[in-house]
Swiss-Prot record:
Protein name, per record: Histidine--tRNA ligase
Family affiliation: Belongs to the class-II aminoacyl-tRNA synthetase family.
Keyword Ribosomal protein: no
A cellular component annotation (GO) from this entry: cytoplasm
Chief location bin: cytoplasm
């Protein structure tokens, strides 16, 4: 008897049916916006993450040396991969590029609520537009994904910030500040106690007094963020606040501004983020961690050897989305769904197989007996797979040139002429033949 590996999960059919619904919903929204599906490898060179992703992800890599002596890693995230893919075909691709991909990723971290060592995400990215409209479209896709899953604005909150505001404020202090390290501290602000957070800012180069001032500035009211440029005397901060406002204005045009909250304590810990960043949270706090996040990474393509290319994207994680949907009561029941079970009694397989094939050709989920079971065993199986309708094809039925249609929810049944079933009906049921 073997157990599954810690942090890795099995998904049985009932669970997968609900998960498939969620994945299809996310991908359908992206495709309605014109995002095109791509496929990506499970392995990448380890050095790609060492160079591009930041210390936290590098520490969590599943990395090893393959039989050819190459250092490789299971992909912990997709953004570096799609950046590499974009650079490889940059001259051939018509821009802007809009890509979507759903697949598993791997990080060696401690499993906890909504976090596993193997996890699934749907990545959505735009390459080739620096316009606030691109940021707003990404935010609109995120909101539409959530609402198409059945969530309402009362269920979630998307917190929006700007990395250039954070870096500009940090650089305005007269201190030798490690800006990326300080931003990583901000990203962990809600996950550690306040003193530990201030210690992290101090380790990044701020004095404790400056750290307190910086933290107070992060909590400024959204309506007053534009004053940060004057407070800091930083032109970079002024430019960033203008850009953030332009994104919010575009989000208003997309119809999603009401779902966005400006929060400068939102930072995103990965080093490659540049401009607008955002994270989605459960508005009740019951799902304690971020549901998903995203933002701009305008420098990453150039860092991969490509021409300077602005980019923006996000990646909803399926595990945390499931937690949010379950908390809100919109996650579908984890049960099998079968339209028809074609039950055969005696030597009736040719007719039963023909009926099953006809129903499948109409797009229905149809099962039939493949184990030579008794009538009672087949009925029990039909109930177990949640079949809506059972088509009974018995020898006595066929002698009368008919089959029996039985609805499983109420037990009603009716005899139907064999020549009339399935007939011209797209979804033939008891009601179509009852007198």
């Amino acid at each position: 008897m073997y157990d599954s590996v810690k942090g890795f999960r099995d998904f049985y059919p009932k669970e997968m049916q609900a998960r498939r619904w969620a994945m299809d919903t996310l991908e359908d929204v992206a495709q309605r916006y014109g995002f095109r599906e791509i496929g990506t490898p499970a392995l990448e060179p380890t050095e790609m993450y060492v160079d591009k992703s930041g210390e936290e992800i590098v520490e969590e890599l599943y990395s090893f040396e393959d039989k050819g002596g190459r250092k490789v890693a299971l992909t912990p995230e997709l953004t570096p991969t799609v950046a590499r893919m974009f650079v490889a075909k940059q001259q051939e691709l018509s821009k802007p590029i809009k890509w979507v991909s759903t697949r598993p990723f791997w990080r060696y971290e401690e499993p906890q609520q909504g976090r596993f060592r193997e996890f699934y995400q749907t990545n959505v990215d735009i390459f080739g537009s620096a316009e606030p409209t691109a940021d707003a479209e990404i935010l609109a896709v995120a909101v539409d994904m959530l609402t198409d899953l059945g969530l309402t604005g009362e269920d979630f909150e998307i917190r929006v910030s700007h990395r250039d505001i954070l870096s500009g404020v940090l650089e305005s202090f007269e201190a030798d500040v490690d800006v990326p390290e300080a931003i990583r501290a901000v990203d962990k602000r809600a996950k550690v106690d306040h003193d530990e957070y201030l210690d992290a800012l101090a380790e990044a180069g701020l004095s404790y007094g400056q750290a307190d001032t910086f933290d107070e500035m992060l909590q400024i009211d959204a309506e007053e963020i534009e004053t940060l440029g004057d407070l800091t005397g930083s032109e970079d901060v002024r430019t960033a606040t203008d850009n953030l406002q332009a994104v919010l204005d575009a989000a208003e045009d997309f119809g999603v501004r009401e779902h966005l909250t400006v929060s400068l304590t939102t930072a995103r810990g990965l080093d490659y983020y540049t401009g607008v960043v955002f994270e989605c949270f459960d508005s009740t706090g019951e799902v304690s961690r971020s549901v998903f996040g995203g933002g701009r990474y305008d420098d990453l393509i150039e860092g991969f050897g490509g021409q300077p290319t602005p980019a923006v994207g996000f990646a909803p994680g399926h595990a945390t989305l499931q937690l949010l949907c379950q908390r809100a009561g919109v996650w579908p029941a984890e049960e099998l769904s079968t339209d028809y079970y074609v039950l055969q009694v005696g030597d009736t397989r040719p007719t039963a197989a023909r009926i099953a094939r006809d129903l499948r050709e109409r797009g229905h989920v149809v099962e039939s007996d493949v184990a030579d079971r008794s009538f009672g065993a087949q009925m029990g199986y039909a109930d177990g797979i949640n079949a809506e309708t059972v088509v009974i094809v018995g020898e006595q039925d066929l002698e009368n040139d008919e089959v029996t249609l039985k609805e499983m929810d109420d037990g009603e049944q009716v005899s139907v002429p064999l020549s009339a079933f399935p007939g011209d009906y797209d979804r033939p049921t008891f009601e179509d033949f009852a007198e």
